[in-house]
UniProtKB/Swiss-Prot annotation:
Subunit architecture: A double ring-shaped homohexamer of HslV is capped on each side by a ring-shaped HslU homohexamer. The assembly of the HslU/HslV complex is dependent on binding of ATP.
This protein's name: ATP-dependent protease ATPase subunit HslU
Keywords of this entry: ATP-binding, Chaperone, Cytoplasm, Nucleotide-binding
Gene that produces this protein: hslU
PANTHER family hit by this protein: ATP-DEPENDENT CLP PROTEASE ATP-BINDING SUBUNIT CLPX-LIKE, MITOCHONDRIAL-RELATED (PTHR48102), ATP-DEPENDENT PROTEASE ATPASE SUBUNIT HSLU (PTHR48102:SF3)
Species of provenance: Cronobacter sakazakii (strain ATCC BAA-894)
Protein family: Belongs to the ClpX chaperone family. HslU subfamily.
Taxonomic placement: Bacteria, Pseudomonadati, Pseudomonadota, Gammaproteobacteria, Enterobacterales
Amino acid sequence: MSEMTPREIVSELDKHIIGQDAAKRSVAIALRNRWRRMQLNEELRHEVTPKNILMIGPTGVGKTEIARRLAKLANAPFIKVEATKFTEVGYVGKEVDSIIRDLTDSAIKMVRMQSIEKNRYRAEEMAEERILDVLIPPAKNNWGQPEQQQEPSAARQAFRKKLREGELDDKEIEINLAAAPMGVEIMAPPGMEEMTSQLQSMFQNLGGQKQKPRKLKIKDAMKLLVEEEAAKLVNPEELKEQAIEAVEQHGIVFIDEIDKICKRGNVSGPDVSREGVQRDLLPLVEGCTVSTKHGMVKTDHILFIASGAFQVASPSDLIPELQGRLPIRVELQALTAEDFERILTEPNASVTVQYKALMETEGVHIEFTDDGIKRIAQAAWQVNETTENIGARRLHTVLERLMEDISYDASDLGGQTITIDADYVSKHLDALVADEDLSRFIL
């Protein structure tokens, strides 16, 4: 679990997301409250439930990007799902309980990686011994079993020194490695994914753990042996317990496009992919127990963050019970031309930085001037105003159009420097931006 303070979390989000300070503050406080709760005594800790968040804002302003960055910062089980993929229980499609199952699977992977990393030093020693056994086979007794020696031989110590110094990295050896489990692909109808994964696990375990001889360079064999030995040191039962504990105490679920499951006014009959999904989400958000293949998982202290554009529907169109379980509302603002300028220059991996790096691979150096950046931002904002407002995603469309000729001819332009200024942008984009019909279909 992350121990970052809210200020540190916001500072980290600022490196990738421009504006939207209220949303950043809310998720930062929610993340910090996870840590604060764990510092309480057990009796009070059980009573403190997470304050779920509803993020409201037009498309392309940073809702999903906040979720992506939060997943990296949280250091906790995290899953992002689309609300539109689920249907009410009993109908064809995924049921909402699969959210918790997927969250538990991601926790198992996360805890396994942490456990492997914790045991890496010991695993490296064991892998080293296995390689030395191949290079200098131990002496055997009359029954064909390796003799137990009090101290390693001088030759073994000499090879160990060479191995650690990398002198033997390119030497090829034949070594027995665990064979890949038998692959079984089972196609199941929607909603039956849990049964499918259990059947696959059963078939994979039928053959037992087999070993297969492989010829590899020592440096490649060492990597595989370390992974294999580290996996042996992981206790599967402890792994499940720790993963379930991590999900129950620190799990975060991000539900995107929640506005798409709001009930439409004049719809009659069963609304299985809208209001039905909301009703199924209620017990998860309120707190219930979900059965997974790893064990029972309680959702009482899982943090839920929902987001939606709410351009057609409004938050009040959600069923009242679900509204009550999303007490913190955060409104994200539409982006201005000034925001677009900052998006093009400030983030660590801004779109302009990406295009520069891509062209550098062909030996072409791209320079964006300040007035060029400003003109690109104005063009994107203008198209958003005159057609559909898709937020910062419009920058990708505009830049792709702007860079099309350079990208096409890059292999013939090696060693050249191309400056993208206001005149260059105007020459390539003004006609498209001015014509609303063209910009609607091209930009």
